[in-house]
Amino acid sequence: MLAVMSEKTIALVTGANKGIGYEIAAALGALGWSVGVGARDERRRTDAVAKLRAAGADAFGVSLDVTDDESVAAAARLIEERAGRLDVLVNNAGVAGGWPEKPTTVDLKTVRRLVETNVIGVIRVTNAMLRLLRRSAHPRIVNQSSHVGSLALQTTPGVDLGGISGAYAPTKTYLNAITIQYAKELSGTNILINNACPGYVATDLNGFSGTQTPEEGAAIAIRLAALPDDGPTGQMFDDNGVVPW
């Protein structure tokens, strides 16, 4: 198995059983990569893998709850046993609170839940997978961020990001900040880490109110996952280029 797997790029996409995550997995599979479909829900994970395989992708399921230490450790063990390394990690899993949501009235339980998934979950998965990524010749990390996490955009007059967000937007700002710190720590290595802004995509995260399709939203993460060795690191991008922090 390891001999066969070593000939392919090995990717793991968290939250890949639906929405943007599924479309990222599908596109990477279409490139001929072996793609781990990370998801908590066993039925949805199994269905997503079956659908991807039916389309010709080399997909495999990874039981993964980004908020649980043992689940993440078990996922790392599975990938090591299956492939011996990891080439691309796409931290796509995320949750949203209410919208709009004022910081003066936000439920602190909501804030904690969002930070646990959108920030700590990314740190937990990234740190667990770093040992496997270091074995790759071309390791890439892509974190799914958002325009709403950009402090520059949030403070630019006339820019409409959908109203006040007391929980979700700040978690993406926090994610942006930690990505910068990872880039600083990993400078001098061959690991490239960047954040992707998918745009306003119609998913269950926003009650399918978005104006873009999941396929369109997946495009920038796919580009960042396949960056050349001299590609950028420590930046945030959307389909039009660099997004200010």
Sequence positions of predicted segments:
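Canonical Rossmann dinucleotide-binding motif of NAD(H)/NADP(H)-dependent dehydrogenases/reductases
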Residues: 4-36
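Conserved glycine-rich Rossmann-like NAD(P)H-binding loop of the short-chain dehydrogenase/reductase
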Residues: 31-47
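The beta1-alpha1 cofactor-binding region of Rossmann-like NAD(H)/NADP(H)-dependent oxidoreductases
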Residues: 42-43, 63-77, 108
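A glycine-rich helix->loop->beta "capping" turn
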Residues: 57-58, 78-91, 97-99, 107
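Hydrophobic positions on the long internal alpha-helix
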Residues: 90, 125-129, 133, 178-179, ...
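Catalytic loop of short-chain dehydrogenase/reductase
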Residues: 95-115, 134-187
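C-terminal helical subdomain
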Residues: 173-176, 188, 195-196, 203, ...
